[in-house]
Amino acid sequence: MTAMRNAEVSRNTLETKIAVAINLDGTGISRLNSGVGFFDHMLDQIARHGMMDISVECQGDLHIDAHHTVEDVGIALGQAFSKALGDKKGIRRYAHAYVPLDEALSRVVLDISGRPGLEFNVEFTRARIGEFDVDLVSEFFQGFVNHAAITLHIDNLRGKNAHHQAETIFKAFGRALRAAVELDPRMVGIMPSTKGSL
């Protein structure tokens, strides 16, 4: 029987108080309360398209702006992801996904490598989506990458609507994560690296 791949992480600073939980083998259920509506909508895309159960509770310094909230949720989710993944034996490790939404198309390629790295190539067509600063999209992914220790390439290949650009990115990220953490029946108990470690 496969061990449960889930984890909980709490992170408390002077800027945010966060509790997150993740189940890598879930059904796409999310309970999200970051205090930032658009961000919750994007996190829901990761859960639904990644078939992961994700819970986020955050009290942040939103009287300043959403920067600390979004970045710190990325950090906490990255920590929870790494913890839930465990020793990484048997996973497929590499994955990619293309996701369209009307005129927008994004590609996400990732490697659960043990080496944090983000290549974020997105030129949003406007600076804000409602009240949400689009610069925070890369801040979320940088926080996640640094603490999940994955290599992540995000490219928005085309798009005119900034909401569509963001949504295709998060959907593709969820789908790529789902494929990368999938257990390969031919790799049971085997580390997916010629080095023998990740």
UniProtKB/Swiss-Prot annotation:
GO biological process, any: L-histidine biosynthetic process
Catalytic activities: D-erythro-1-(imidazol-4-yl)glycerol 3-phosphate = 3-(imidazol-4-yl)-2-oxopropyl phosphate + H2O
Principal location listed in the UniProt entry: cytoplasm
Top-tier EC class: lyase
Keyword annotations from UniProtKB, A to Z: Amino-acid biosynthesis, Cytoplasm, Histidine biosynthesis, Lyase
Places the protein is found: Cytoplasm
Coiled coil: none
PANTHER family: IMIDAZOLEGLYCEROL-PHOSPHATE DEHYDRATASE, IMIDAZOLEGLYCEROL-PHOSPHATE DEHYDRATASE HIS7
Name the record gives this protein: Imidazoleglycerol-phosphate dehydratase
Organism taxonomic ancestry: Bacteria, Pseudomonadati, Pseudomonadota, Betaproteobacteria, Nitrosomonadales
The encoding gene: hisB
